[in-house]
Regions:
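Anionic-ligand binding patches
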Residues: 2-4, 11-127
Length: 127
């Protein structure tokens, strides 16, 4: 059985296939982007919505960027920060020496009955 990964990003699908060691079918469908500070809530909403449209088990993902100096912002709203002020704008907001950041990826799997969620965190610094 091929894993259906709902994403518009070919690179994410290739990377997931490589990491999981299985064949991935990338499917791009329109999904509502809910507003929440809880990445798990966002991912679960996307997974259930994707399953409702496709009627097959699905995997989805979303990301969060937690900048320590900004109290965890922009969090799951990173896409809107990026579109609004860009990478340089985010970097310009940081004045203190601590420019540490957590890049969090949340993955969700939903088969119509069971939702599973996992997060991966990469620690880094804003240049």
């Amino acid at each position: 059985m091929k894993l259906v990964f709902v994403t518009g990003n070919d690179n994410k699908a290739r990377e997931a296939a490589q990491i999981l060691g299985t064949e991935i079918e990338r499917v791009k469908i329109p999904l509502d982007e809910i507003q929440s500070t809880d990445l798990r809530v966002i991912v679960e909403h996307k997974a259930r919505q994707a399953y409702a449209q496709l009627k097959t088990p699905v995997m989805v993902e979303d990301v969060s960027l937690a900048i320590k100096q900004l109290g965890g912002l922009p969090g799951p709203f990173v896409k809107w920060f990026q579109e609004g002020i860009g990478s340089q704008g985010i970097a310009d907001m940081l004045s203190k020496p601590d420019r540490s950041v957590d890049y969090i990826v949340g993955y969700g799997f939903f088969d119509g009955a069971r939702f599973e969620y996992v997060e991966a965190v990469t620690k880094g610094m804003i240049a």
